[in-house]
Each structure stands twice: as structure tokens, then as C-alpha cells.
């Protein structure tokens, strides 16, 4: 189980989504749910993912920050740098970037947005346009505070 330790040296040994990772009951339930969905249900998460990623890029530009966002479909990840990210190891943050992301996460929590400490975000069918607007405003406000620190 050492490979699942939080850090090995200064890098995560194996990233893990957590509780539901490879759980056969969860996977079966997810598959059953997907069989009931219409094709448009699969298109909506892609659309809102694109909307969020483009919105984040606009916020970073507005704040004149050298941050970036990666992702596909309903997933996105914020990176407080402009290094090329091709693998999960490329996304590894140095200690200053970790502190920056922790501050960013706390500022978002103050604005009622839960965001992982390593910058990962996940969207779903229940995500509304109002939710996206709230997220992007919270990111803009939070980055204003973080940048001023």
C-alpha cells in the first residue's frame, strides 16, 4: 500500500480518486445509470466543461496571471504556472505553488466553492449556468485576494 501514500519524496507515488476507485458496486451503478441516459446527457457535460475552461482562461487573463487550465469533457484542472503539462508528473507543483493553491482553495471555500487542493474540478449534469457563473466569479474574487498576498 506504500504506492498510495500521500507523497513519496516530493511527488505523489500514484494519484488516486479515493473512496470509489475501482469499486465494483459503484462501477455497476454508474454503468446502469449511463444506460438510462439519452445522448444529449453526454453532450451537456462536455459543453459546460468547455464553458468553464474558457471562462477560467478569461479570468486568468483578466488578472494577468500566468496560470493555465487543462482538461477534457466535464473535468478541468487549474495549474498556477505555464509549464507544458503532458503527464500527471508534469502537473506536479513546487512548494511555492502548493502554498498558492492552498490559499486559492481556502479563498474559494470562503465563497462557497469546493475545489480540490491540487486544482481538480469535476462537473456533472446538475451543473447549471448559474453554478458556472458563481464558480467563475468566485475564482475571479479569490484570485484577486491570492494575488494581493
Identify the meaning behind each predicted range.
Residues 1-149:
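Conserved N-terminal phosphate-binding loop of PLP-dependent enzymes in the Aspartate aminotransferase
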Amino acid at each position: 500500500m506504500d504506492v498510495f501514500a500521500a507523497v513519496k519524496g516530493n511527488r505523489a507515488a500514484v494519484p488516486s480518486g479515493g473512496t470509489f476507485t475501482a469499486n465494483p458496486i459503484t462501477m455497476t451503478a454508474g454503468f446502469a445509470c449511463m444506460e438510462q441516459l439519452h445522448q444529449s446527457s453526454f453532450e451537456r457535460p462536455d459543453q459546460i466543461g468547455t464553458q468553464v475552461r474558457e471562462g477560467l482562461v478569461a479570468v486568468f487573463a483578466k488578472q494577468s496571471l500566468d496560470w493555465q487550465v487543462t482538461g477534457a469533457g466535464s473535468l478541468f484542472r487549474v495549474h498556477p504556472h505555464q509549464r507544458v503539462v503532458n503527464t500527471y508528473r508534469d502537473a506536479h507543483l513546487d512548494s511555492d505553488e502548493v502554498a498558492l493553491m492552498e490559499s486559492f482553495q481556502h479563498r474559494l471555500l470562503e465563497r462557497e466553492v469546493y475545489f480540490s487542493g491540487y486544482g481538480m474540478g469535476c462537473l456533472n449534469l446538475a451543473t447549471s449556468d448559474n453554478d458556472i457563473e458563481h464558480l467563475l466569479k468566485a475564482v475571479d474574487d479569490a484570485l484577486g485576494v491570492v494575488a494581493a498576498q
